[in-house]
């Protein structure tokens, strides 16, 4: 499977930290985040990479070359084959895909160049292959679902609704958001090339909701963007502490199993209605603490 990495954005929200570096070149514990992405891909057998570049493109292209060289930071080989597409003008976060579609002859992995992730990509790809949709989103819970877009899916993981943060939402909903990793079919890029900027979510993916062709792959693994100075600092700490690596499902997971009735919620006999479900005092804070420690909280 080929990987396409979108690395052409300007990173205006983090410009104070980036300076004259493109955002994918920001260091995480001494190595550019893009180098860490390439390392994760290589370790899992994804060695054919196409990077779209724009803002400060030479900084990326001169550092990585065609992938046959070695890292200036570690001295180790990059171990991948890299091609580039240079945006002459801003094309949004998906416009470049239509310009490179002749290089995409099978389903491909799409990710942003400023995202730190440590996930089992083979498991993700296997899910996509089995379900056979046009696109699969990598989805996970986050710490602020109330102001995030929500993904609603049926029991077969087919997306039925894609709610933006402005959309009305039900009183009860699952904390499931798009993490920014995707597997896409090149069939999505057929037809006329759109003019100007193209928004991946609003123009390509969201219209697939409810058609049965958009899947979501739920995972607790680590995926976090570095769009603000605060998020960048958090990512650096998560990598240094080992928290990011520990969440990869190729590794054994630490978990706390929590009984339900009378332990985390008020006992009401046989619970029949969600409106009767009431968390006991301190439970929400305890679950948050479990999550912050990097453990899985499993309710049984």
Please report, for each region that a protein language model flagged, where it lies by residue.
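Substrate-recognition element of Asp-dependent hydrolases with the DxDx(T/V) motif
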Residues: 52, 283, 287-300
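Conserved N-terminal catalytic core of the sugar/cofactor nucleotidyltransferase
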Residues: 2-5, 26-113, 121-123, 228
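Basic, amphipathic juxtamembrane/active-site segments
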Residues: 126-130, 269-288
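Short beta-strand-to-loop element that shapes/binds the nucleotide-sugar donor at the catalytic cleft/hinge
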Residues: 55, 136-153
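Active-site metal-binding loops of divalent metal-dependent hydrolases
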Residues: 10, 114-115
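Glycine-centered short loops/turns at secondary-structure junctions
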Residues: 45, 132, 291-294
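N-terminal nucleotide-binding beta1-loop-alpha1 segment
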Residues: 1-19, 250-261
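Catalytic-core segments of class I nucleotidyltransferases/pyrophosphorylases
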Residues: 108-109, 116, 122-129, 140-145, ...
């Amino acid at each position: 499977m080929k990987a396409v990495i979108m690395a052409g954005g300007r990173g205006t929200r983090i410009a104070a930290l980036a300076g004259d570096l493109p955002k994918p070149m920001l260091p995480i514990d001494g190595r550019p985040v893009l180098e860490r992405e390439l390392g994760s891909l290589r370790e899992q057998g994804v060695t054919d990479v196409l990077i779209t570049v724009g803002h400060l493109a030479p900084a990326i292209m001169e550092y990585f070359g065609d992938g046959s060289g070695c890292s200036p930071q570690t001295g180790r080989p990059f171990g991948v084959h890299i091609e580039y597409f240079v945006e002459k003008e801003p094309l949004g976060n998906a416009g470049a895909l239509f310009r490179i579609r002749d290089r995409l002859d099978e389903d491909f992995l799409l990710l942003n160049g400023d995202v730190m992730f440590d996930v089992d990509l083979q498991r993700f790809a296997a899910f996509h292959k089995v379900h056979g949709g046009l696109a699969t989103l990598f989805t996970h819970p986050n710490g602020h679902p109330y102001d995030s877009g929500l993904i609603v899916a049926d029991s077969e993981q087919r997306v039925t609704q894609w709610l933006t943060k402005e959309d009305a939402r039900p009183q009860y909903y699952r904390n499931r958001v798009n993490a920014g990793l995707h597997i896409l079919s090149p069939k999505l890029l057929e037809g006329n090339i759109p003019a100007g900027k193209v928004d991946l979510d609003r123009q390509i993916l969201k219209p697939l909701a409810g058609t049965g062709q958009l899947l979501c792959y739920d995972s607790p693994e680590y995926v976090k963007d570095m769009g603000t100075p605060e998020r960048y600092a958090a990512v650096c700490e998560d990598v240094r502490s080992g928290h990011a690596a520990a969440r990869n499902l190729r590794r054994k997971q630490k978990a706390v199993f929590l009984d339900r009735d009378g332990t985390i919620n008020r006992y009401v006999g046989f619970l029949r209605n969600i409106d009767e479900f009431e968390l006991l005092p301190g439970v929400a804070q305890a679950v948050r603490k479990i999550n912050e420690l990097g453990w899985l909280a499993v309710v049984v």
